[in-house]
């Protein structure tokens, strides 16, 4: 168990490289399985654009910290590993914060303090402790990319649902927040829609997250039943 409250996820001894990514993306999803990083998940996702920006920033931090901590795993003594990991995470987050302030200033103003708070994100520290200290650099990078992609997907879906219900748009202000190249993402889903106020308020985030959690449970159960049925058919054929 991580000191940050993140569950120490057991990993198989051997995996095909892409399995490190896919298992982190779905099986150990940061928000839907480990229930970590709920503060930005609920607070930032008023629009899909905000969710995408926060997700990409977190993904960058996860990939870089996983790579750095994994490369130092044989040189960090157990007595000081937590301060060292927090220092590495803080350094990477500071660089990410400065980069977003320089090149995505409008998005930086919207996300504000939540970028700096990635330092305290239990998903980052917990994964560094439970995975990166035990695995080589390449699997750690793939794991970080999978964790970040899964987290980004959840933020975008929650933000997209709330934005559509709240204002009838999708990825609004993407060109101003992310850059002019993202103008094509801006969609008016429901023209002249007055919106549902609850959707853009904090309770709306909890409600949408609850539906996503339920949907994942249903999908996982159906997949398990399908695998069990297939296994039973193979046994009969043998």
From Swiss-Prot:
UniProt GO BP: electron transport chain
EC number(s) given by UniProt: 7.-.-.-
Superkingdom in the source lineage: Bacteria
Role this protein plays: Part of a membrane-bound complex that couples electron transfer with translocation of ions across the membrane.
Protein name listed in UniProt: Ion-translocating oxidoreductase complex subunit E
Gene name, Swiss-Prot/TrEMBL: rnfE
GO cellular component, one term: plasma membrane
Stored NCBIfam families: PRK12405.1, rnfE
Spans through the membrane: 24-44, 52-72, 84-104, 106-126, 141-161, 195-215
Membrane topology field: Multi-pass membrane protein
Keyword Mitochondrion: no
Protein localization: Cell inner membrane
HAMAP family associated with the record: RsxE_RnfE (MF_00478)
Subunit structure: The complex is composed of six subunits: RnfA, RnfB, RnfC, RnfD, RnfE and RnfG.
Pfam families: Rnf-Nqr (PF02508)
The keyword Transcription regulation appears for this protein: no
Family: Belongs to the NqrDE/RnfAE family.
Record keywords: Cell inner membrane, Cell membrane, Electron transport, Membrane, Translocase, Transmembrane, Transmembrane helix, Transport
């Amino acid at each position: 168990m991580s000191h940050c409250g993140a569950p120490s996820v057991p990993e198989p001894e051997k995996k095909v490289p892409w399995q490190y990514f896919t298992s982190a993306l779905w099986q150990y999803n940061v928000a839907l399985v480990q229930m970590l990083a709920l503060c930005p998940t609920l607070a930032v996702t008023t629009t899909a654009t905000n969710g995408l920006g926060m997700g990409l920033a977190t993904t960058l931090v996860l990939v870089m910290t996983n790579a750095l901590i994994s490369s130092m795993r044989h040189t960090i003594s157990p007595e000081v590993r937590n301060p060292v990991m927090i220092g590495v995470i803080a350094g990477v987050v500071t660089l990410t914060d400065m980069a977003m302030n320089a090149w995505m200033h409008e998005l930086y103003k919207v996300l504000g303090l939540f970028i700096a708070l990635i330092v305290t994100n239990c998903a980052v520290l917990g994964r560094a402790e439970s995975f990166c200290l035990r695995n080589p650099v390449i699997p750690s990078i793939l794991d970080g990319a999978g964790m970040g992609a899964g987290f980004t997907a959840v933020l975008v879906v929650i933000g997209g649902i709330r934005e559509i219900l709240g204002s009838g748009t999708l990825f609004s202000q993407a060109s101003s927040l992310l850059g002019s190249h993202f103008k094509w993402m801006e969609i008016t889903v429901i023209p002249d829609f007055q919106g549902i106020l609850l959707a853009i308020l904090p309770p709306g985030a909890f409600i949408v997250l609850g539906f996503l959690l339920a949907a994942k449970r249903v999908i996982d159960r159906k997949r398990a039943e399908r695998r069990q049925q297939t296994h039973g058919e193979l046994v009969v054929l043998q």
